[in-house]
């Protein structure tokens, strides 16, 4: 989110065919809720293209990239690593500490979101293993709640630059405005 140290989301693991929609939604959620970029495994090219297309149409800044070195990406990260897992410490117990590291200590934050069985190395590399409710549910829901807690709701007021289209909020119906006609 602009004005803060970087927040990146790393999708750890992707099963083509099975995880395509979920991986795409991890990227879209990261973009919509204040992250600066998402990094997908190199076999998630379809998701990368979809998120890049949405960013082009609805604005950024937001970067999307692929890597074939997930463990190295975590190991080489130059800031705090938060691994979202239902087995982690309760988000409400650690959110203040993580928010302080990000905003006061100016540390970039990498949020690791698992897509399949995450190896124990990831748990060990993480500065925080964080659970949202410590119950089984969607990793997209966990990411959304975590980012909202990290940014304390400020991401909901986000402005998007260089958009071709904009959704016009309405009580009823759908309205999308083409901005290049203005």
Language-model segment annotations:
Residues 12-14, 84-87, 113-116, 133-134, ...:
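Fold-independent oxyanion-binding glycine-rich loops
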Residues 6-13, 109-111:
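Short, hydrophobic/glycine-enriched beta-strand segments
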Residues 48-121:
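S-adenosyl-L-methionine/SAH cofactor-binding core of RNA-modifying enzymes
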Residues 38, 81, 129-131:
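Short, well-ordered beta-strand core segments
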Residues 1-10, 18-26, 31, 46-49, ...:
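Haloarchaeal acidic low-complexity proteome signature biased toward cell-envelope/secretome components but also
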Residues 122-171:
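Structured adenosyl-cofactor binding patch, chiefly the S-adenosyl-L-methionine
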Residues 36-44:
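Short internal beta-strands
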Residues 35, 77-79, 126-127:
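Short, well-ordered alpha-helix to beta-strand connector turns
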């Amino acid at each position: 989110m602009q004005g803060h140290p970087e927040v990146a989301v790393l999708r750890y693991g992707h099963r083509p065919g099975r995880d395509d929609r979920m991986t795409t939604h991890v990227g879209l959620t990261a973009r919509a809720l204040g992250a600066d970029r998402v990094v997908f495994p190199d076999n998630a090219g379809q998701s990368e293209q979809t998120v890049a297309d949405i960013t082009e149409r609805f604005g950024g800044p937001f970067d999307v990239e692929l890597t074939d070195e997930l463990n190295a990406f975590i190991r080489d990260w130059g800031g705090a690593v938060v691994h979202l897992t239902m087995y982690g410490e309760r988000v409400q117990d650690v959110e203040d500490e993580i928010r302080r590291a990000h905003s006061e200590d100016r540390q970039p934050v990498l949020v690791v979101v698992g897509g399949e069985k995450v190896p124990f190395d990831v748990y060990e590399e993480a500065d925080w293993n964080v659970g949202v409710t410590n119950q089984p549910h969607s990793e997209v829901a966990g990411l959304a709640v975590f980012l909202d807690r990290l940014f304390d709701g400020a991401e909901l007021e986000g402005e998007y630059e260089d958009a071709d289209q904009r959704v016009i909020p309405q009580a009823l119906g759908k309205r999308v405005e083409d901005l290049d006609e203005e």
